[in-house]
Swiss-Prot record:
Keywords: Amidation, Antibiotic, Antimicrobial, Cytolysis, Hemolysis, Secreted. GO terms for cellular component: extracellular region. This is Chrysophsin-2. It comes from Pagrus major. Has hemolytic activity against human red blood cells. Seems to disrupt the membranes by adopting an alpha helical conformation. May play a significant role in innate host defense. It is found in: Secreted. Its main location: secreted. The keyword GTP-binding does not apply.
C-alpha cells in the first residue's frame, strides 16, 4: 500500500511540475 501511495505521490508531483513548467513556457 505504501509503495503505491509513494508511487502515486511521485506521479502527481511530476505531473504538477510538468504542468507548471509548461505554463511558464
Amino acid at each position: 500500500f505504501f509503495g503505491w501511495l509513494i508511487r502515486g505521490a511521485i506521479h502527481a508531483g511530476k505531473a504538477i511540475h510538468g504542468l507548471i513548467h509548461r505554463r511558464r513556457h
